[in-house]
Design a protein with these regions (language model features):
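Acidic anion/phosphate-binding donor-loop and adjacent secondary structure
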Residues: 171, 184-203, 244
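A short, well-ordered alpha-helix in the C-terminal region of glycosyltransferases
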Residues: 332, 339, 346-360
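A short, active-site helix/loop in glycosyltransferases that binds the activated sugar's phosphate group
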Residues: 155-178, 189-191
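Conserved acidic donor-binding segment of nucleotide-sugar-dependent glycosyltransferases
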Residues: 211, 316-330, 339-344
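Membrane-proximal helix-turn-helix segments that form the acceptor-binding/catalytic region
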Residues: 85-93, 118, 138-158
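Acidic donor-binding loop of glycosyltransferase active sites
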Residues: 268-287, 300
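C-terminal alpha-helical cap of glycosyltransferases
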Residues: 339, 343, 360-377
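Conserved catalytic-core segment of nucleotide-activated headgroup transferases in glycan assembly
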Residues: 198-266
Length: 377
C-alpha cells in the first residue's frame, strides 16, 4: 500500500482558506464537507487557485495552454494558477482529491492520470454546468470530445449538485453512468436560519442577488423600472449604477469569492426582503441554486425561472414552496411580483413550506455524509 501524507486534498477557488480561518460566522456549504471531515480526524489539505511559485516561463506556457484548450474545446482551464511542482506533489501524496468545480477538475485531470499509473488516487469532481455544452464548429466538437472522454475516464466520481444535469448526463453518457453521483447542493441550516418567525408586515422590498452570468440582469433592471412602487435591492457585481433606470433600486456591490459582504450581512438582506427574485436564462447550469436555498432557509419566498437546469423538480412544487415562471417576459414577471407582493397569506404559506422543504431535504449534513461514502478510506 502506497503511503499518503493527506487523506483528502481539497482544490478550491481562491478565498476559501481565508474564510475558514476567519472568526466571522459564515455558511459552510461551499466547503463541500471540509468542516465535517475536519472533526473526524481525516488528514486534510487545501490548495487554492492563486499565483503559484513557478518560473516565469512555466507560467507563460500554462497560460498559453489554458487559452489554447479553452478556445478550441470551449471548456474551462485554470492551469496557470494551479500547476506547480509543489501543488503536484501535494496531489500525488493525497489519497482523495476533491475539486470544488469542474474547471479545476479539468485543469488537473491530465496530471492525475499520470499519477494514477504509480498509485491509487481517488479523484472526485464536484460540478454544476459541465454538461451545458455550447454549440460550436466541428473542430471544437472533435477536440472537446477527445478531452471530455479522457476526463471522464480519469475521474472516479462526478458529483452533480443539480438533479436536472445529472439526469441529462445519465441519459447521454451511459458508458460512464457508474461514475455519476447526484448529491443535491445543501446548505448550512445552522447558519441560514431565521432569527424569528418571518413577519411579512415587517418584511419590505424585493431582493435580487448574484453575479453568475446565466442570470438575466437586463430583465431585473426592467422589472424594477416597471414596478416603481416597490423597493428593490440588487446585490451583484454585474449591474452598475448607471445601468439602473429607476429610483427605487438600492444597488450593492456583491461577490461571494471577493467577500465584499459578510454572510451575516447577506443573511440580513434575505431576512428583510419580502421576496427574492432570480430570473435565469434557459440553461442546464443550475444558476441561482445556492441563493434560492439560502432565501428559502430564512423563510423568504422565491420567484425564479423554470429552466432545463432548475436544480430539483422532484422536491419543489410550483406555487407550494416556490414560484416558477415559464418564460422571462417582462409582463409575466412584473404581474407576478405585483400580485404576490401584497398577498400576505400566500407569502406566509410559501415561507412555511419552503422552510419545511429545506429542513427535510437540504441540510448540509446530508451532503457531507453522502460524500463520505465515496472516499477512498
Amino acid at each position: 500500500m502506497k503511503n499518503y501524507k493527506y487523506d483528502i486534498t481539497y482544490v478550491f477557488g481562491s478565498g476559501r482558506n481565508e474564510k475558514l480561518l476567519s472568526k466571522q460566522d459564515h455558511g459552510k456549504e461551499f466547503f463541500y464537507g471540509y468542516p465535517y471531515f475536519s472533526k473526524k480526524d481525516y488528514r486534510l489539505n487545501i490548495i487554492e487557485t492563486e499565483n503559484q511559485n513557478s518560473s516565469y516561463l512555466t507560467k507563460k506556457i500554462l497560460k498559453f495552454m489554458d487559452g489554447f484548450f479553452a478556445k478550441f474545446s470551449k471548456l474551462t482551464f485554470y492551469m496557470n494558477v494551479l500547476i506547480s511542482r509543489d501543488t503536484l506533489s501535494q496531489i500525488y501524496n493525497s489519497k482523495n482529491v476533491i475539486t470544488s468545480n469542474h474547471g479545476i477538475g479539468m485543469s488537473l485531470f491530465f496530471y492525475i492520470s499520470l499519477m494514477k499509473i504509480l498509485k491509487k488516487i481517488n479523484f472526485i469532481v464536484i460540478l454544476s454546468g459541465l454538461f451545458a455544452m455550447r454549440k460550436s464548429n466541428i473542430i471544437v466538437r472533435v477536440l472537446r470530445k477527445i478531452i471530455f472522454t479522457y476526463f471522464l475516464c480519469v475521474v472516479d466520481y462526478l458529483i452533480f449538485t443539480n438533479r436536472s444535469e445529472y439526469d441529462f448526463a445519465v441519459k447521454n453518457y451511459t458508458k460512464f453512468e457508474s461514475k455519476f453521483v447526484c448529491l443535491p447542493f445543501c446548505i448550512d441550516t445552522d447558519f441560514w436560519r431565521p432569527k424569528s418567525t418571518p413577519d411579512f408586515e415587517e418584511k419590505k422590498g424585493v431582493l435580487f442577488i448574484g453575479s453568475n452570468g446565466h442570470r438575466d440582469f437586463n430583465l431585473v433592471i426592467e422589472i424594477a423600472n416597471k414596478l416603481e412602487n416597490i423597493p428593490f435591492t440588487f446585490i451583484t457585481n454585474r449591474i452598475k449604477d448607471q445601468d439602473i433606470k429607476s429610483r427605487n433600486v438600492t444597488n450593492i456591490l456583491g461577490d461571494w469569492n471577493r467577500g465584499y459582504l459578510s454572510d451575516e450581512e447577506v443573511k440580513s438582506y434575505y431576512e428583510k426582503a419580502r421576496l427574492v427574485i432570480l430570473p435565469i436564462n434557459n440553461t442546464l447550469v443550475s444558476s441561482g441554486q445556492s441563493a434560492g436555498l439560502q432565501a428559502a432557509s430564512v423563510g423568504t419566498p422565491l420567484i425564479t425561472s423554470s429552466t432545463i437546469g432548475f436544480w430539483d423538480y422532484k422536491t419543489y412544487q410550483n406555487r407550494k414552496n416556490i414560484i416558477l415562471l415559464n418564460n422571462n417576459t417582462l409582463d409575466l414577471w412584473a404581474e407576478t411580483i405585483q400580485s404576490l407582493y401584497n398577498e400576505k397569506e400566500k407569502l406566509e404559506d410559501l415561507s412555511k413550506e419552503s422552510l419545511h422543504l429545506i429542513n427535510s431535504n437540504y441540510k448540509l449534513v446530508n451532503f457531507d455524509r453522502e460524500l463520505e461514502k465515496y472516499l477512498l478510506i
